[in-house]
Amino acid sequence: AASIGYFLSPLLTKYSLVEFEWEQTLKYFMIFIVIGLAVSIFLFPAKTVINSSQADRDQTFLSAIKEAFSHRGYILLVLGFFVCGFQITLVGTHIPGYMQDRGMAGWSATIILALIGFFNIFGTLGMGYLGTKYKKKNLLSILYSLRALSICVFIFSPPSMLNSIIFGITFGLLWLSTVPPTNGIVAQIFGTKYLSTLFGIVFLCHQFGAFAGAFLG
């Protein structure tokens, strides 16, 4: 659902900016946000019974965090998700200005972002499946490497609509496909009792990387 929203959002935003200017566009987005907030009030999770081992039941919140940060693999996941946030926010924030600097039409950046949102659907689902067949840490290494490679190839390629489309498709397949293997690794190492907390810390570092990507880009 989020990917569909990311696919439609650039197209609708660009159209609204052309037709109604930014003030009216901002009002439309505020309406959608209020609607989403109103709907979220009714999304209460159902109570579920979680079967866990005795060790999981005895473990406290603080001991789970201490265990995680004493694990080398968890530290690498945190650092990897920092890079993840840096990469996707660098592209998502600065691709419009970059395309304009390269002399491309304003719609080229819109097409790239829309393609990223659309193909993220297939990338995320595909990576979730591959995570059941291959080692998740190897998949993550390949993903981050392909992301960096795709950005470098795009930057050093001559500006054209074809290259923009290829980049949008490629980066879309790699966009949030890091989430399934990362979440899976956390669950495999530490169990599911504090999965939300431990993955939340990983995602917090992702947001620090996102800040760096937006600010330094």
What are these regions (language model features)?
Residues 1, 185-196:
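Paired intracellular helix-loop junctions of major facilitator superfamily
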Residues 1-10, 200-213:
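Glycine-rich segments within core transmembrane alpha-helices of 12-TM secondary carriers
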Residues 2-48:
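Helix-loop-helix hairpin linking two adjacent transmembrane segments in secondary transporters
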Residues 10, 69-129, 179, 213:
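Extracytoplasmic gate region of multi-pass secondary transporters
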Residues 14, 97, 183-189:
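Intracellular helix-loop hinge segments at the cytoplasmic ends of transmembrane helices
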Residues 44-63:
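Flexible cytoplasmic inter-helical loops of multi-pass small-molecule transporters
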Residues 104-113, 160, 164, 195, ...:
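Juxtamembrane helix-start elements in MFS-like secondary transporters
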Residues 114-120, 124-127, 131-185:
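C-terminal transmembrane helical hairpin of 12-TM major facilitator-type secondary transporters
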